[in-house]
């Protein structure tokens, strides 16, 4: 686990495994990498947690996937986003909102946890896109 956590490239696999096990909140500890990049005023992604310069490594851009698909929870449920599933992994976050660009238009999703920890989800879908969660 420490090997996977320390190797930035392997985090994509660690994040998916934690998500599938229902332990996505454990990824919060690994967010320091991206916070450090912002604090160091880097304009591209680092290769490892110990780097203080950006080398433009695509695998460190994992957050570009995590935010819309996992934190917001917006994923296609059919080819080309004909149907969409919205299932956020909230972790330790209290709220999130954002827009996801799809071939069919912009999807807006936002959620917030209340004092009782209940999740309140609001979304807008482009014309012709169905919400798939109701089928489950």
Identify the meaning behind each predicted range:
Residues 20, 25-136:
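Non-catalytic C-terminal accessory modules of carbohydrate-active enzymes
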Residues 1-5, 9:
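Single conserved hydrophobic/aromatic residue that forms the stacking wall/gate
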Residues 14-15:
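Conserved small-residue packing positions in alpha-helical repeats and bundles
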Residues 6, 18-19:
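Active-site loop and adjoining helix of the penicillin-binding protein/serine DD-peptidase-beta-lactamase fold
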């Amino acid at each position: 686990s420490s090997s996977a956590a320390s190797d930035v490239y392997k985090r994509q696999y660690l994040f998916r495994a934690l998500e599938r096990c229902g332990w996505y909140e454990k990824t919060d500890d690994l967010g320091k990498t991206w916070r450090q990049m912002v604090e160091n005023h880097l304009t591209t992604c680092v290769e490892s947690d110990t780097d203080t310069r950006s080398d433009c490594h695509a695998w460190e851009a994992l957050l570009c996937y995590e935010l819309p698909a996992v934190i917001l929870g917006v994923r296609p449920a059919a080819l080309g986003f004909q149907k969409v599933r919205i299932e956020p992994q909230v972790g330790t976050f209290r709220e999130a909102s954002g827009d996801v660009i799809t071939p069919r238009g912009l999807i807006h999703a936002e959620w917030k946890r209340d004092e009782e920890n209940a999740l309140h989800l609001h979304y807008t879908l482009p014309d012709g896109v169905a919400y798939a969660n109701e089928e489950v």
